[in-house]
Design a protein with these regions (language model features):
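Conserved S/T- and glycine-rich ATP-binding loop of Class I adenylate-forming
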Residues: 59, 76, 107, 178, ...
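Conserved pre-ATP/AMP-binding loop-to-beta segment of ANL
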Residues: 19-20, 148-183, 190
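Conserved AMP-binding A3 loop
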Residues: 33-35, 170-171, 179-203
């Protein structure tokens, strides 16, 4: 593994190498192969790019463990944005506080969280995306709305003759570059964000 230069390079090579193998399975649900994961990641990258999401912007994810949660996480990391995972069990006010404190631009939510949070409590968010199907719960950005409505057409225009392994090209990360802000459970007050660089994620894989 030490011959692979970065975390995202490892993800990229794993997807290409295992293109037709099973990657993610939901309990009593569907199985995604690596090429399915790659396709979903690429669609989210197109959505981010056309919504003016820049590398280094923060994107939060809050939902139960699922293949769609994993896809969103990987899409954020491999785009070069900073992922802010939020525990699904947190109360709405904790979620609001973390989104605001982290200055997240977008928020992915699962089915339960979507019904509990109050978008008006997170005024700087540009959009909330529903994890099960990547539909928009709310959009405050015309570019985000347009990109989501035309996402399939944008994908087809970019890849008119199928999406293939050679199209998988991810953000080249630096070991010291910020990858994730992980918030604690906040047992002594408000949750505190721990800033994790890419080398921390790579260290977990290498271990």
């Amino acid at each position: 593994m030490n011959s692979i230069p970065s975390f995202n390079s490892y993800i990229e090579r794993s997807i290409i190498k295992n293109w037709h193998l099973d990657a993610l399975t939901d309990y009593k649900g569907a199985t995604l192969q690596y090429h399915d994961v790659a396709r979903k990641i690429e669609k989210l990258h197109i959505l981010f790019e056309n919504s003016d999401v820049k590398k280094g912007d923060k994107i939060a994810v809050c939902g139960r463990n699922s293949s769609q949660w994993a896809v969103a996480f990987l899409a954020i990391i491999t785009y070069g944005a900073i992922v802010v995972p939020i525990q699904n069990e947190f109360k709405p006010e904790q979620i609001h506080n973390i989104v605001n404190h982290s200055e997240s631009k977008l928020l992915f939510v699962g089915d339960v969280v979507a019904t509990e949070i109050t978008p008006d409590e997170m005024p700087t968010l540009e959009g909330i995306i529903y994890l099960p199907d990547n539909s928009l719960v709310i959009s405050r950005s015309e570019k985000l709305t347009y990109a989501r409505e035309h996402l399939n057409a944008m994908f087809g225009h970019k890849y008119p003759k199928y999406f293939r392994p050679e199209h998988v090209k991810y953000h080249v990360d630096d070991p010291e570059e910020l990858a994730m802000i992980n918030y604690t459970s906040g047992t002594t007050g408000f949750s505190k964000g721990v800033m994790l660089p890419y080398r921390a994620l790579w260290g977990n894989l290498d271990y």
